[in-house]
């Protein structure tokens, strides 16, 4: 098993799609039962979120990955992303997410938010 930490979302920085996640958007998010997917594909569940919390930078995630192939991708510096439902947003120059329902966390090759990355890996 491999464990990793990283940021699935970065606050107050526009992503490549023109979305901005604001502090507090994940205030109701819980780790319990949140899957880790490969490239947002529900058929490729590779682990589970152990803990998540908002800090000054964004949504910090710690997760366990059981998929042996995922360890190499993690160590290569995988990007992170998240699946969500919008609960509250403001539209303007950017779409600003004020409240989101977290569905999943994904390891991705090209994250919409380039700063959303795995920052530490331990284990196999």
Model region roles, listed by residue range:
Residues 1-32, 121-124:
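Polar/acidic, low-complexity leader/linker segments enriched in S/T/G and N/D
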Residues 3, 48-124:
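Residue microenvironments linked to proteolytic maturation
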Residues 9-13, 40-42, 85-91:
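Short, flexible beta-strand-to-coil junctions
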Residues 14, 23-24, 29, 39, ...:
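Surface-exposed loop/turn and secondary-structure junction residues enriched for glycine/proline
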Residues 27, 35-36, 45, 53-57:
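N-terminal assembly/attachment segments of tailed bacteriophage virion structural proteins
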């Amino acid at each position: 098993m491999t464990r990793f930490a990283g940021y699935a979302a970065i606050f107050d920085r526009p992503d490549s799609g023109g979305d901005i996640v604001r502090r507090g958007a994940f205030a109701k998010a819980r780790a319990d039962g949140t899957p880790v997917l490969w490239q947002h594909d529900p058929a490729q569940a590779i682990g589970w979120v152990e803990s998540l919390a908002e800090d000054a930078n964004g949504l910090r995630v710690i997760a366990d990955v059981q998929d042996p192939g995922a360890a190499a991708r993690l160590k290569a510096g995988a990007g992170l992303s998240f699946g969500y439902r919008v609960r509250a947003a403001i539209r303007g120059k950017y779409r600003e997410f004020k409240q989101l329902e977290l569905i999943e966390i994904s390891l991705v090759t090209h994250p919409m938010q380039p700063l959303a990355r795995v920052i530490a890996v331990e284990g196999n």
